[in-house]
Swiss-Prot record:
The lineage of its organism: Eukaryota, Viridiplantae, Streptophyta, Embryophyta, Tracheophyta. Interacts with the Pto kinase. The gene is PTI6. This is Pathogenesis-related genes transcriptional activator PTI6. Disulfide bonds: none annotated. GO terms for molecular function: DNA binding; DNA-binding transcription factor activity. SMART domains: AP2.
Length: 248
């Protein structure tokens, strides 16, 4: 093979660089340690060959595409992440931390307080919400340390109202002793005198004429006469023959 028949290969390289900011949790490291470079290399073997008609040396071009991605730490992302971590919308920070209240591993909330007299913690129980546990802690704190104790919620002070009750003292009187006029309750006397009459004393049986109604004829019964045998002697002997004759 002659020297002129050896093809000439020409390599060309095209580099495209892109900077990409990413968040990294390793804030203690320097920026140089955090920076990374990702290279994507693609060689185009089907590049167009260039040749002349006079039979000169053929030059073959091979293109090499290189894409570089620079991974750089983003300070903005770190700041946003910190702000999101302390955002009040998050479930963790939305719950306020109460004094004497901690969450158990299974989810419930426990309340406990340190007793200054005994020098140890007193268990107050577990509750469904941290607010309930905080209220129980506040009551125990006021009971142990007084109204000046530090509580989770402001202690409502109720105004004390003094009620004066007037008591009437009564003296018991022994049998046979004199009683005061205040202790003796006299029985009510009748307003009618002995010689007075009741409103209906003068109204006899069937005497309705006092009201203007003449109903005497309504109660008038026919007269009937009885023989002397029936009412002759009040203590006379009973004679059965008298009744027998009447029955006939």
């Amino acid at each position: 093979m002659t020297e002129n028949s050896v093809p000439v290969i020409k390599f060309t390289q095209h580099i495209v660089t892109t900077n990409k900011h990413v968040f990294s949790e390793h804030n203690e490291k320097s920026n140089s340690e955090l920076q990374r470079v990702v290279r994507i290399i693609l060689t185009d073997a089907d590049a167009t060959d260039s040749s002349d008609d006079e039979g000169r040396n053929t030059v073959r071009r091979v293109k090499r595409h290189v894409t570089e991605i620079n991974l750089m730490p983003s300070t903005k992302s770190i700041g946003d992440r910190k702000r999101r971590s302390v955002s009040p919308d998050s479930d963790v920070t939305r719950r306020k931390k109460f004094r004497g209240v901690r969450q158990r591993p299974w989810g419930r909330w426990a309340a406990e307080i340190r007793d200054p007299t005994r020098g140890k913690r007193v268990w107050l129980g577990t509750y469904d919400t941290p607010e309930e546990a905080a209220v129980v802690y506040d009551k125990a704190a006021v009971k142990l340390k007084g109204p000046d104790a530090v509580t989770n919620f402001p202690v409502s002070t109720t105004a004390e109202v003094t009620v004066t009750v007037t008591e009437t003292e009564t003296e018991s009187v022994a049998d046979g002793g004199d009683k005061s006029e205040n202790d003796v309750a006299l029985s009510p006397t009748s307003v009618l005198c002995d010689n007075d009459f009741a409103p209906f004393d003068n109204l006899g049986f069937c005497e309705v004429d006092a009201f203007g109604f003449d109903v005497d004829s309504l109660f008038r019964l026919p007269d009937f006469a009885m023989t002397e045998k029936y009412y002759g002697d009040e203590f006379g002997e009973f004679d059965f023959d008298d009744f027998a004759l009447e029955a006939r």
